Amino acid sequence: DAFMVLSRIIASFHNEKGELMIEGLTSTDMQVTELEESFLKKMLGSDEINLFDTESISKRLWLEPALDVLAIDAPPVKEAVNLVIPKASAKISLRLPPTEDPEHAMKMLEDHVMKNIPWNAFVKFIPNSKGSGVVADPNKPFTKELVNSFNSIWENDTAYIGVGGSIPFANDFVREFPNAELVLVGAADEELGNAHAPNESVQIDHIEMLIESLVQTLKNIS
């Protein structure tokens, strides 16, 4: 049954603690703000989420590879009948820390899939799009000036988080303009941000403060 084969392969990606079981993948070593468990559960909308006694939530969230199943093609529930399923497929997303080579990661993912095929079933691995990430240096002049503006306008210390580094165009920018600084900033609703979702939300006052910070920084360096 193709669905059972697919289920076994998907189950092989993680162990009982939710740790990724694909051999050969690497993590990124850098300093980021440590998220508190209570904040993360509030952000995810549930106090019942099992975080598996993770040593560092921030490292696992931002600096290690993560895999999820985006979609599965198989008979829908409404059309299901009591027959053996002849074929099934899934689209897998493997999010990488910015220092991981996507070519290497794709090969490791394929090797894992092919090593975990049950019952001598026929399985085809089809690579899709991939992109390289980048690590932005927070100690460069423009970045430090921008952080000073953030601190002043928000009246709070800036926290560094590990997001955006796997966006492929960021690496393209660094490659094309090696002497330029890369700073990834954005505005979001702290309670209802829902990035990438249909109901993604931003706080208007945060957008205004972000613009003010950028303007102040440009004035300071001009």
Model-assigned labels for residue ranges:
Residues L96-E100:
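Structural beta->alpha junctions
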Residues I92:
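Active-site helix-to-loop segments that bind/position phosphate- or nucleotide-bearing substrates
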Residues D1-G18:
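A short core secondary-structure module
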Residues S7, A11, E110-M114, V147:
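Generic solvent-exposed, charged/amphipathic alpha-helical segments
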Residues L20-E79, L83-K87, P102-M108, N116, ...:
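An extended, acidic, His-containing surface patch that forms the Zn2+-binding/catalytic region
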